[in-house]
Amino acid sequence: MMLSLCAIAGLLLAPSIQAERIRDLTTVLGVRENALIGYGLVVGLDGTGDQTTQTPFTTQSLRNMLSQLGVAVPTGTNMQLKNVAAVMVTAKLPAFARAGQKIDVVVSSLGSAKSLRGGTLLMTPLKGVDNQVYALAQGNILVSGSGAQAGGNRVQVNQLNGGRISGGAIVERSVPADFAGGNVIMLQLNNDDFSLAQQISDAINRHFGHRSALPLDSRTINVAVPPDGPGKVRFLASLQNIPITLGPTDAVVVINSRTGSVVMNRDVVLGSCAVAHGELTVEVNRTYKVSQPDTPFGGGRTVVVPETAINVRNEGGALQQIDAGANLNDVVSALNGIGATPNDLMAILQSMQSTGCLNAKLEIN
């Protein structure tokens, strides 16, 4: 059986050297998004909202909202509503976002609602980790999933308990940033690499002058910049477009134990080894037969007798030779030749690494 491997570089041969821009390899320290979260209500659902008996917080939230709008609900009223759902609203506040800017929000059901399709999110304050309100969200929810049910049968495509509102929140407060102050910025590499940190630092020094950049460790580079704000923006825009010629990177194999997917980059190399792969299958089948007496007046009685059959089957197990692979195509061909499933391949790759046949970093998620 052929094994389909997801490869970052594809199955085609790729050159070992490539050019990238500094902006694709680094980020500027302090220039980042900030997470926002809020609790709100979605109304206008077509009978697919929360069951109020199971989610009392939905009823409580609705009472509080109506009270703020001047609508008094008599104490002890049992509100059986099916078109309201309690939700959590999340968003990301971009760096340098200003008041009045719109951002996207994600709405997720918190209770027992079956679907948020067709619902409208009521005004929801979005707070940061400092408990300050930075945005207000409201609008119609777009749900990508769909579903139908009838006669006890149900068909559903994708999730119905979550959706998005494009531009559904308006920024009310910006996050303070000290980007314009000071004459130093920090570049952070996306991945730890001493060689790449030194390479980027050398490229910046060649472009702007000696000692403009200094690598502090495998991830951080200190860069001297003009003190004024506009000059710093122009400097950083020019810096981020400096090309960097990348050499060989670390060989990495990433295994997702939940989905069974295996991802490897083009630098993975296999050493020569022999692999024996097989499965022990035990099948237990139980059948029932009716036993009745031969003579109708012999005094016997009809009984049901269970019969159990056990079959033990050992499949595979042949020793297979794997030649050393110098590129991704050779590695994929060798692993496909084993005929293992993705789940079996996880154990095989771990064993290969233990014996020194897999010259790569193995990451299991």
Curated annotation (Swiss-Prot):
Gene Ontology BP, a term: bacterial-type flagellum-dependent cell motility
Localization terms from the record: Periplasm; Bacterial flagellum basal body
Keywords for this protein: Bacterial flagellum, Periplasm, Signal
UniProt xrefs under InterPro entries: Flag_FlgI (IPR001782)
One of the Pfam families matching this protein, by short name: FlgI
Chief place of localization: periplasm
Segments passing through the bilayer: none
One GO CC annotation: bacterial-type flagellum basal body, distal rod, P ring
Molecular function terms, GO-annotated: structural molecule activity
HAMAP family assigned to the protein according to its UniProt record, in alphabetical order: FlgI (MF_00416)
PANTHER family from the UniProt entry: FLAGELLAR P-RING PERIPLASMIC PROTEIN FLGI, FLAGELLAR P-RING PROTEIN
Function (record text): Assembles around the rod to form the L-ring and probably protects the motor/basal body from shearing forces during rotation.
Protein family membership: Belongs to the FlgI family.
Binding partners and assembly: The basal body constitutes a major portion of the flagellar organelle and consists of four rings (L,P,S, and M) mounted on a central rod.
NCBIfam families: PRK05303.1
Protein name according to UniProt: Flagellar P-ring protein
Organism: Sodalis glossinidius (strain morsitans)
